[in-house]
């Protein structure tokens, strides 16, 4: 995966989905802008220790990520056609396992790319534009303009099932983040269904590949 794509995904998608300003009445552009600002402040403040304190990143993600993302909608998208035939218990388990996996992925990304994110925050520029809003769905474009790299557009997909906006997905250069997970899990989903993927994700976590325990940042 190109470094430009990874950096863009980390700066925009992670920081948007890992922060929460989803108060009632907050519009989609304001939500995304404030979320990115809050996320950049967090990384800038703790950049020197994030790589050595995975529990700090985990705590940040746990505090914000689960509140802003709709885990069921994300799980349905990743599961694709295999969601419809799965029993309720399998759906619940898959949703929980996938969410834990995403937390681990985002925690690792924020820790690994913290220096690059700080560099971007210091020298780059970010623009925000509402691309589409139709009833309870909206797309906000985050234009990342690094000083010495090509510009990257990240589209944040939101929906409003109730009184506040939630992040559904993010597209970097037209590529959906959740679609990457769906593609990766598709062979096992076809063979073993949601239960098989849940087994694999849980084994990965118990083997040490999952997110660490939470702890306050120093």
Stretches with model-predicted labels:
Residues 83, 100-101, 146, 173-177:
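Solvent-exposed loop/turn segments at secondary-structure junctions
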Residues 151-180:
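Short beta-strand edge/turn micro-motifs at domain boundaries
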Residues 26-110:
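Early exported N-terminus immediately downstream of N-terminal targeting peptides
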């Amino acid at each position: 995966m190109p470094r430009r794509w990874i950096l863009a995904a980390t700066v925009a998608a992670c920081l948007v989905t890992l922060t929460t300003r989803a108060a009632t009445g907050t519009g989609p552009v304001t939500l995304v802008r404030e979320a990115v600002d809050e996320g950049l402040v967090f990384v800038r403040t703790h950049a020197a220790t994030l790589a050595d304190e995975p529990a700090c990143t985990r705590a940040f993600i746990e505090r914000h990520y689960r509140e802003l993302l709709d885990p069921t909608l994300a799980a349905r998208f990743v599961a694709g056609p295999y969601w419809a035939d799965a029993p309720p218990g399998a759906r619940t388990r898959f949703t929980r396992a996938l969410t834990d996996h995403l937390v681990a992925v985002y925690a690792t990304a924020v820790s690994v790319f913290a220096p690059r994110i700080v560099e971007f925050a210091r020298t780059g520029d970010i623009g925000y534009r509402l691309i589409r809003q139709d009833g309870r769905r909206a797309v906000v474009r985050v234009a990342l303009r690094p000083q010495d790299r090509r510009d990257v557009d990240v589209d944040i997909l939101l929906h409003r099932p109730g009184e506040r906006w939630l992040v559904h997905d993010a597209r970097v250069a037209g590529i959906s983040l959740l679609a990457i997970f769906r593609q990766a899990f598709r062979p096992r989903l076809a063979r073993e269904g949601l239960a098989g993927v849940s087994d694999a994700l849980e084994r990965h976590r118990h083997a040490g590949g999952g997110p660490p325990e939470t702890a306050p940042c120093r």
